[in-house]
């Protein structure tokens, strides 16, 4: 059995990092809304559904010409938003099949909710800096390194993982 550990930390970003975090959240919201509109369009025109991978490939093709500002954010923000959209449609169709009343995925509005985005760490780009000894970020302890954003200070002290022990 593989156990996944998750930690939740509150960030203490500077002004520039706040702007970058807002851009990531905006790109995720845009990708979700674009994907939802595209999903509906494909279903109405072709009578089939699509998936997150197909939408992400199409968004990447359009990025160069139509959405060059998306190069300012990590590739993970829009990709994870499209995965969330696919999961929303899976939940919608599963609910319809079982007879439950389930709402159709809705467009995300800019001012209706707290801005958020997710990043994937399968490539190991997100790292906790605990002791300030990282050669790429000297002297930065109590920080987390996020792709395209850099080392962001944490408000609280991170938990150190004990070797061979229980946390």
Stretch-by-stretch model annotation:
Residues 1-167:
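Nucleic-acid substrate recognition interfaces
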């Amino acid at each position: 059995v593989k156990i996944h550990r998750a930690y939740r930390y509150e960030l203490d970003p500077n002004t520039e990092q706040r702007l970058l975090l807002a851009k990531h959240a905006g790109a995720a919201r845009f990708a979700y809304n674009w994907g939802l509109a595209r999903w509906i369009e494909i279903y109405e025109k072709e009578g089939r559904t699509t998936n997150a991978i197909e939408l992400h490939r199409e968004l990447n093709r359009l990025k160069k010409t139509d959405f060059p500002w998306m190069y300012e954010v990590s590739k993970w923000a829009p990709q994870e938003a499209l995965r969330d959209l696919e999961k929303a449609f899976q939940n919608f169709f599963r609910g319809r099949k079982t007879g439950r009343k389930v709402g159709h995925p809705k467009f995300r509005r800019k001012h209706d909710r707290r801005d958020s985005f997710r990043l994937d760490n399968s490539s190991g780009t997100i790292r906790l800096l605990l002791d300030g000894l990282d050669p790429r970020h000297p002297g930065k302890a109590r920080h987390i390194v996020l792709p395209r954003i850099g080392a962001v200070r944490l408000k609280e002290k991170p938990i150190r993982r004990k070797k061979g022990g229980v946390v």
